[in-house]
């Protein structure tokens, strides 16, 4: 292999590793975000009776009380 060909292969390897690392980082971020949303929903579910009796909370979180009243 010539020097140009080795340089092109090197650039392709660097480009491929950069693309893989940037996309895997985004997936991890979305995973953390989804986990935080799920955690928030679990904490709201624990307070379901209080939330369903409060009109402001009920309108903000209709999924807890079975829809809008």
Curated annotation (Swiss-Prot):
GO terms for molecular function: acetylcholine receptor inhibitor activity; ion channel regulator activity; toxin activity. It comes from Conus textile. The modification Glycine amide is found at residue 66. It comes from the Eukaryota. Residues 22-49 form a propeptide. This is Alpha-conotoxin-like Tx1. Expressed by the venom duct. Its main location: secreted. Disulfide bonds join 51-57, 52-65.
């Amino acid at each position: 292999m010539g020097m140009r060909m080795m340089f092109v292969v090197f650039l392709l390897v660097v480009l491929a590793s950069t693309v893989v690392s940037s996309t895997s980082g985004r997936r991890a971020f979305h995973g953390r975000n989804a986990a935080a949303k799920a955690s928030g929903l679990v904490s709201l579910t624990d307070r379901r009776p209080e939330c369903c009796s409060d009109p402001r909370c009920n309108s903000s979180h209709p999924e807890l009380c079975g829809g809008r009243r």
